[in-house]
Regions:
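Glycine- and aromatic-enriched membrane alpha-helices
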Residues: 2-359, 403
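Acidic, glutamate-rich low-complexity segments that are typically intrinsically disordered
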Residues: 357-403
Length: 403
């Protein structure tokens, strides 16, 4: 009997490890989606640079999270013999891999907002600071109960802050940090002339659409596999993700007047918003969440670009920042049993965490993206923006060879 129990435990640990590894690979693939979404949106002269930044950001994120960030969030390090790390089929290692892919999404989100003008080196430095210190602080607060915030919310409002797959912890944080960076860098040269918006059309709608589809597919790993064990898997999460994606698509199709950029970002808005409550909502609540998110994205993107003159290239603040905030609040609404949800969530806790988080996220943006005081050090020269960052970098390399 003991041998049978031991064999069952080995099977369970092995299955859970494989399960979360597959989730990590699916979310890792989403970074290809981030890359192609940015490549399709920026101008042709900046496509190669966009690809290079996403991959480089991921590499820096992996180092920062492995050596510092994961320890800050969970108090876990990997400075142990390999024999100790392979306990339970190495589940702890693969869990790190899975959560790393979430952490690395933050700089990928920010990259889309500051595209075509941020300098390569300073952006990588900001990535290291954010993934090592800023993101793990918020991650630990919500997902590891650090500093007693969750206990306080539970005592005060009857339930802790609930964010199953990161509407707030990942997406809202990334979106608000991106807004801080966009405001810090200013708009691209030529984006506004005499106070009016100058159109800068996406370079490739097919690449933009490809990026959107890669993200949509990977998102089911992002949400469903946030259960982190086979025993925790719920078909409710999958269907809620599907219907929120559909809701975002329909809203952006109707309100965005068939604009392909809006159409392919609408489903992403719905998926961002449903992350928080995908394990609690009724599918109709998830559909409503996606509909609101799609409409919110179209309205906010238009307002930021035209009315407020904020040059957020991919619209990451509306998409991730605002829709992420809406997702946290929607979880508190549609997660209630009275509206068909599973319950165990408090609207007060969801709103309170957002009010506290907004100020700190802005401070984190100024601390990470705003560490370097001089705009010239953070932003490419006018020649780089006009000719394209990649071409200018090649010219500098040729001049060094000639010298």
């Amino acid at each position: 009997m003991d041998n049978l129990n031991s064999a069952v435990q080995v099977l369970i640990h092995g299955s859970n490890t494989l399960f979360i590894l597959l989730g990590a690979v699916m979310v890792l693939a989403m970074h290809a989606g981030f890359a192609f979404l940015e490549v399709g949106t920026v101008r042709l002269k900046n496509q190669v640079n966009a690809l290079s930044k996403i991959l480089s950001d991921f590499a820096i994120s992996a180092l920062a999270y492995f050596f510092v960030g994961y320890w800050i969030a969970y108090g876990v390090t990997f400075f142990h013999p390999a024999a100790a790390l392979t306990v339970d089929s190495g589940y702890a290692l693969v869990k790190f891999f899975f959560l790393l892919t979430f952490a690395a999404a933050i700089p990928a989100i920010i990259s889309g907002g500051i595209a075509e003008r941020a300098r390569f080196g300073p952006q990588l430095c900001a990535t290291a600071l954010i993934v090592a210190f800023v993101y793990p602080f918020f991650e630990g607060l919500v997902w590891n109960g650090n500093f007693g915030l969750q206990e306080w919310l539970k005592l005060e409002f009857g339930a802790p802050f609930h964010d199953f797959a990161g509407s707030v912890v990942v997406h809202a944080l990334g979106g608000w940090l991106a807004l801080a960076a966009v405001l810090l860098l200013g708009s691209r040269n030529g984006r506004y002339r005499d106070g009016k918006l100058v159109a800068m059309a996406p370079s490739s709608i097919p690449f933009l659409a490809l990026g959107s589809w890669i993200l949509i597919i990977g998102w089911f790993g992002f949400n469903v596999m946030s259960a982190q064990t086979l025993a925790g898997v719920s078909g409710l999460v999958a269907v809620n993700s599907l219907l929120a994606m559909v809701g975002g698509t329909m809203a952006s199709l109707l309100i965005g007047r068939n604009d392909p950029g809006f159409l392919h970002n609408g489903p992403l808005a719905g998926l961002v918003a449903v992350c928080a409550g995908s394990d609690l909502m009724h599918p109709i609540g998830a559909l409503a969440t996606g509909l609101v998110a799609g409409a919110l994205f179209v309205w906010a993107f238009t307002a930021t670009q035209v009315r407020w003159k904020i040059d957020d290239v991919l619209g990451v603040w509306p998409l991730h920042g605002l829709c992420g905030v809406w997702g946290g609040i929607a979880c508190g609404i549609f997660g209630q049993q009275a509206l068909g949800g599973l319950g165990g969530v408090s609207l007060e806790s969801q709103a309170k965490k957002r009010l506290q988080g907004g100020k700190k996220e802005g401070e984190g943006g100024r601390g990470g993206e705003g560490r370097r005081k001089e705009r010239r050090g953070r932003r490419g020269r006018k020649e780089e923006e006009e000719e394209g960052e990649e071409r200018e970098r090649k010219k500098r390399g040729e001049r060094r060879k000639e010298g």
